[in-house]
């Protein structure tokens, strides 16, 4: 048997270890796979990313899992990643995608102390837009099965949970405004604020999304295509809102600042309206911002999930328990209502990104990869 992994500096050649590197029913893991690779830095996902069909399947190291992906998540920030905005020194090519849910099909010796072949896991790690991804065991989270709902909790759910817990100061009776409230992370911000007994206002773009927001407890959905957000906030909430969960940027950010109550808090988790521009930014009225904040003793604070990774696992555990107990709706959008049908296969990731930026999705956009005939899950 060929060398499969290293345990420290020792090559593992024990034949009894071979079972960790075999798929179910004894069929070998294929030598080649498909994956999405960023080959050019650009916020235009279609221009930046290439589907490569003949890539070697990687082997896991001593502390790693090899995961056959079943569901992968699409995030607004995928185009920031493809543009190289998170690391100005990054060089192409590099693998795309942040998160996945799949099945462990191989693992290193150290990783086998906590995981086994055939186990379902969720993970947040680079390179998820692939048929197989090597995932460090330390970041993998066991889940009860291969369900897309578990994927919604990774980036989207934990962003809402940690940011509101650490920065929101939620308490009974507070008024909370959630922008893009029917999206992947907005849906969780709405529900978590309601769990804290807050009054929740949510912006969205359609009657269907308004209905969804009502179904998860939103007190006042605002369809900005039929109502002016600023007018509604001034007329119905003259004292302002206490907390804003903001992901849109631009004019929506300006409206949210104007709507803050005395000692209000605005949490910026993104500014998606600017991501497709060359700079990645959306214009805001920054010149008047200090005066507005001073006048109300208000604050604006950013939240980037990577800066809160020590809180990630605890947040996932809490959200998984909520979902298992029927306390949390995890809305999944697999493109069933899109013109070309469901998002199935890696080639559909391109359509899924377009779909998101056309503001079509309700809930988290998830791409399904074909199941293996050998899977037990």
Curated annotation (Swiss-Prot):
Compartments, as annotated in UniProt: Peroxisome
Residues that bear N6-acetyllysine: 35
GO biological process, one term: negative regulation of fat cell differentiation
One Pfam family here: ADH_zinc_N
A single GO cellular-component term on record: peroxisome
EC number, as in UniProt: 1.3.1.48
Main enzyme class: oxidoreductase
Keywords, comma-separated and alphabetical: Acetylation, Lipid metabolism, NADP, Oxidoreductase, Peroxisome, Phosphoprotein
Entry keyword Transport: no
InterPro entries, per the entry: ADH-like_C, ADH-like_N, GroES-like_sf, NAD(P)-bd_dom_sf, PKS_ER, Quin_OxRdtase/zeta-crystal_CS, Zn-ADH-like_protein
SMART domains with a match to the protein in the record: PKS_ER
Modified residues (Phosphoserine): 299
GO molecular function list: 15-oxoprostaglandin 13-oxidase [NAD(P)+] activity; zinc ion binding
Swiss-Prot/TrEMBL catalytic activity: 13,14-dihydro-15-oxo-prostaglandin E2 + NADP(+) = 15-oxoprostaglandin E2 + NADPH + H(+); 13,14-dihydro-15-oxo-prostaglandin E1 + NADP(+) = 15-oxoprostaglandin E1 + NADPH + H(+); 13,14-dihydro-15-oxo-PGF2alpha + NADP(+) = 15-oxoprostaglandin F2alpha + NADPH + H(+); 13,14-dihydro-15-oxo-prostaglandin F1alpha + NADP(+) = 15-oxoprostaglandin F1alpha + NADPH + H(+)
Record-listed NADP(+) binding positions: 185, 205, 209, 224, 247, 269, 275, 303-305, 361
Ranges annotated as spanning the membrane: none
General function of this protein: Functions as 15-oxo-prostaglandin 13-reductase and acts on 15-keto-PGE1, 15-keto-PGE2, 15-keto-PGE1-alpha and 15-keto-PGE2-alpha with highest efficiency towards 15-keto-PGE2-alpha. Overexpression represses transcriptional activity of PPARG and inhibits adipocyte differentiation.
Family: Belongs to the zinc-containing alcohol dehydrogenase family. Quinone oxidoreductase subfamily.
Stated name of the protein: Prostaglandin reductase-3
Organism per entry: Bos taurus (Bovine)
């Amino acid at each position: 048997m060929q060398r499969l992994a290293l345990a420290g500096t020792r090559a593992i050649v024990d034949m009894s270890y071979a079972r960790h590197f075999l798929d179910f029913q004894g069929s070998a893991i294929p030598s080649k796979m498909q994956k999405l690779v960023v080959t050019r830095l650009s916020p235009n996902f279609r221009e930046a990313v290439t589907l490569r069909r003949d890539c070697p399947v990687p082997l896991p190291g001593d502390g790693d899992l090899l995961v056959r992906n079943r569901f992968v998540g699409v995030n607004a920030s995928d185009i920031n990643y493809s543009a190289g905005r998170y690391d100005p020194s990054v060089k192409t090519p590099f693998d795309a995608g942040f998160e996945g849910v799949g099945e462990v099909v191989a693992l290193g010796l150290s990783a086998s102390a906590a995981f086994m072949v055939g186990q379902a896991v969720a993970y947040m790690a680079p390179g998820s837009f692939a048929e197989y991804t090597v995932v460090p065991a330390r970041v993998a989270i066991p889940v009860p099965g291969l369900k897309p709902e578990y994927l919604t909790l990774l980036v989207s759910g934990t962003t809402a949970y940690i940011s509101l817990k650490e920065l929101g100061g939620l308490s009974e009776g507070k008024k909370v405004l959630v922008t893009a409230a029917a999206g992947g992370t907005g849906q969780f911000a709405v529900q978590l604020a309601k769990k804290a007994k807050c009054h929740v206002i949510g912006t969205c773009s359609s009657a269907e999304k308004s209905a969804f927001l009502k179904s998860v407890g939103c007190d006042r959905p605002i369809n900005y295509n039929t109502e002016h957000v600023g007018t509604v906030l001034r007329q119905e909430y003259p004292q302002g809102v206490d907390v804003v969960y903001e992901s849109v940027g631009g004019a929506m950010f300006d409206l949210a600042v104007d709507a803050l109550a005395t000692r209000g808090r605005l949490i910026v988790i993104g500014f998606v309206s600017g991501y497709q521009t060359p700079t990645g930014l959306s214009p805001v009225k920054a010149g008047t911002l200090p005066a507005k904040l001073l006048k109300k003793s208000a604050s604006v604070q950013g939240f980037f999930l990577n800066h809160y990774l020590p809180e990630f696992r605890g947040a996932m555990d809490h959200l998984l328990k909520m979902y298992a107990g029927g306390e949390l709706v995890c809305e999944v959008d697999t493109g069933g209502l899109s013109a070309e049908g469901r998002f199935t296969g890696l080639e559909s990731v391109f359509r899924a990104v377009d779909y998101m930026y056309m503001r079509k999705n309700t809930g988290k956009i998830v791409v399904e990869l074909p199941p293996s005939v050998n899977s037990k899950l």
